[in-house]
Amino acid sequence: MFIQHGFSTIISAEKIGRNCWINQQVTIGFSNDTESPLIGDNVTIYAGAKVIGKVRIGNNSIVGANAVVVKDVPANSTVVGIPACIVRRDGERVKELL
């Protein structure tokens, strides 16, 4: 795991997989004491993104800058926006709500 500029970055995850890249001002947090995110392998989370609650970020996925993720992200996907939506899945452009 690589955390770029760890200041203002909050991480409270159930698990973070291998080879993850987390940029500055990211929040990975829980919605209560038992609901923490689970981050898969080879995940990149860009600056300012928020991953909140008992959600899973699938392997090989990207969370775009300032995205707000409150639902599961499938493997091999890119999500952006508030609330986050899928814009790429398995290498193909899509537009899907989470």
Specify the residue positions occupied by each region the protein language model found:
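C-terminal membrane module of polytopic membrane proteins
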Residues: G81, L97-L98
